[in-house]
Amino acid sequence: IWIKLNAKGLKIRQLDRRWAAEMVNDFRDNLLKFLRLNSDEPFQSAEFLNSGSYFEKVKIRSADEFDMMLKLRVSPRLMTEALDNGLFYHIRLARMPLPVNPIRAFVLDEHMLSSSKILSEMYCLVRNDFLWVVNRKRPRSPAVTLSLYRKDTCGDELISVDLVPALEVQSWPVGVRSGPDVDNWLGKKFRQEIRSLPIFYVPKRLKGQTESWRISFSHIEKTLIRKHGNKKTCCESNITKCCRKLCYMLLKSLIEGLKLRFPKELDPLCSYHGKTVFLHTMSTRFDDAMWTPQQLTACFRDLFRAMESHARRGLLPHFFVPECNLFSPAVFPPKALAFLVSVLEEQWREGLPLLKLPAPVPPIRAMSPSEDTSPEVSTDVSATLTTFLPLFALALVFVLFLKFGLRV
């Protein structure tokens, strides 16, 4: 029961969702206007692509963080060189662009396109406006984080926006060209539709590299999570509702709680590990009948056990790049992974305490300073009154009789 109650509390209120959407849309319009007025390319002709948990409708608790991609126009003739198992790349232009081509400013030796230069240029560009505040750069992050405040005050931050410059490329690299394994889940036709979509490269730095790009499938992940049903009618009405998204939101909440409780020990852990486990689980447990709302508790337990199993085996293949292990020692240190396994086992053993709602606190009754809270004193006073009240009443009647009766 408490898992269902917790899941209800994770949903963002419709009023808050509408308010946040209006604010972010206003920000997006202002940023586009700002970029169009600048002569710096390729940002002047950039376009937005919404991504992240809010637009997947799995954001939990509050609509205070948004992710957006800023699509940059580049030459379609690009050459990619895989740096690891197909997640990170060097990108080179087939030939050196002409001096009039604005992308030339970001090209290094051997026609290599610089991820660090594009990210730095974007930082410099967005600092020139007063409608938002640019946050400090985070190590190896592909995003420029902006904070939005009320126009009439410099008080608390209202919304944080991660703005990620991204190169849109139509051709998929060889290692991922077959697409994700969704045949049993969403069908072969849907898989072909996915394969026809472009992919994106974001300026994410691989450890030991300075000019690397990471391949991003966030726009396709959004499609998979929104069109999650084995049948097209899934979640179209209350009759065909499923509990997939609620299970994912519960897992996000658990990961968030673990990160807050053990920030140092679980530093490598992030929400994307949870998303990857969720995508794999939806692909294997594809039948809609396995995800009915009545089975929420059991379904979440299965999802949790899948997360625990991946951690214990030290194997979590990227959903789109299966050769890339998100739990490999190179990206997730063995000590941190062992700690993750232990805390997941502890959570399971103790009944998932991080997801339990806090016990209600009894209301506090206001009391006067002179009020005695001792039960013994209260009992004595009551007994005394019970004994002497009849005698006092009889004495009062006798006095009145003497006073008025004698006069008569």
Language-model segments: residues:
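N-terminal regions immediately upstream of nucleotidyltransferase
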Residues: I1-D64, L70-C124, N128, F401-L406
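Polar/charged alpha-helical tracts
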Residues: R77-T80, S120, C124, K188, ...
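Helix N-terminus capping/helix-initiation residues
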Residues: R13, S114, P198, F332-P333
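Acidic carboxylate-rich catalytic motifs and surrounding loops in phosphoryl-/glycosyl-chemistry enzymes
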Residues: A46-L49, V134-V144, H318-C324
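Catalytic cores of NTP-dependent nucleotidyl/adenyl transfer enzymes across multiple folds
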Residues: K59, A94-S309, P390, V399-F401
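Short, solvent-exposed polar/charged micro-motifs at secondary-structure junctions
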Residues: F55-R61, W172-G175, P329-F332
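Terminal (often C-terminal) interaction modules
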Residues: I1-K11, D26, N30-N38, F43, ...
